[in-house]
């Protein structure tokens, strides 16, 4: 009777209360979301690296091409031959270029001697202003003619066939404006290239 009285009384679900309840971790509940986010980030990084490298290659190629053109902007236009007009021929060693393209390195003996009046020459105009009279002009013209004749006598003889050359009177202002235009064009191209990066 005492044993019945002192028998322990267990509450209901006592075993369930003693078993540890494990709460699910954050990674286990959001595992698929985290994996999808990682894959998307890796894909975005790969695409950005590819775009940056291709743009860098294009910019490097453009800079290299621009540097080559800046070193020698007329490298593909130097000795451009044109077909002679019918009935004309060129002497040996003479080169003619198409209009608008520069010809560099021409020998001085290939330049034709023109008989323009002395007043059209800026050098003799300065001589007239310095000496003050047409007598000085005639003296300067005769000295220039004798120098041209001696240079023509010492120069190798060319065939007598006529040939056509385009002669332009180049002044210092024209040369400076051409250099300034080239400099502005190169600067603009470099700035445009830097802005495109």
Curated annotation (Swiss-Prot):
Its main location: virion. GO terms for biological process: microtubule-dependent intracellular transport of viral material towards nucleus; symbiont entry into host cell. It is a single-pass membrane protein. Residues 139-154 are annotated as: 4 X 4 AA tandem repeats of A-A-A-S. Inner envelope protein involved, through its interaction with host dynein, in the intracellular microtubule-dependent transport of viral capsid toward viral factories. Seems to induce caspase-3 activation and apoptosis. Plays a role in virion morphogenesis by recruiting and transforming the host ER membranes into the precursors of the viral envelope. Involved in virus attachment to the host cell. Interacts with the host light chain cytoplasmic dynein DYNLL1; this interaction is critical for intracellular microtubule-dependent virus transport toward viral factories. This is Inner membrane protein p54. It comes from African swine fever virus (isolate Tick/South Africa/Pretoriuskop Pr4/1996) (ASFV).
